[in-house]
Amino acid sequence: MAKIYTGNEAIDKYLRRNISPNYKINDYGEYWQHYFLSYLLKIGSKEDIQYVMEEYFGEERLLKCKGTNNIIAVIRLGYCLDYFSRSESYLIRAEVAKQGYKPNLFAHDQSVDVRIEVAKKGLASNILIHDRSSVVRQAIANKDLHLDYLATDPDPYVRLSVIDQGYKPELFKDDPSSMVRHFLAQKGFFLEHYVTDEMPQIREIVAKNGIGLDTLIHDKNDGIRFRVAEQGYRPEVLIYDTNSSVRNEAKKHFKKAQSTELFY
């Protein structure tokens, strides 16, 4: 009679082979050449995992796992975190950090890939808002943390993440970054204020929303005047525009206006 380990035959059939933690599945099929531990992570119950990791293998054998992907499987299964937190591989340390293990330690890690995993979990945020990498600070903003502090961050991408959380858009109305102002305009903020913005793409958004057309009809940018024409504003003026696309668009609205007048 076949020996029963976990009671899950999909797992036990491998355990009967007296496998090591580094075993790769050699049965042809979906999991061929997958590490057994990755397989266990996908199909094992909490009880299955506990039995295999603690009774069948044991910590001493797990510490000897080889291969980055196999070690990552051990970490994702929740074992040997302290040991692998000291790994020379930033990929392995980052995986430990993903588990929320010792965030204050990893907040000072030399690798930004490790620190960002801490930030993504919203941990050690009081440390990471001062991180030298803007990507890490941005991850903290994306967790809706310390927005009052990060609102004045020198990096526009961080400030953009702060705004994206809905934090006090009025603070960023005249932001020096056109990217930030463009984002606000796209969201429909301060359109009247942006009628005279230096960035054409922002003025174009304003025109598309039908704001400030009396000013934008004279804009030096052809694309913006085209947007004004699309709104059907003053076609009798724009049919004489210097740009052919603007004139053609204005003619459509001019003819429509004339036919409407004739109808009435």
Q: Predicted segment positions?
A:
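Alpha-helical scaffold segments
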Residues: 2-264
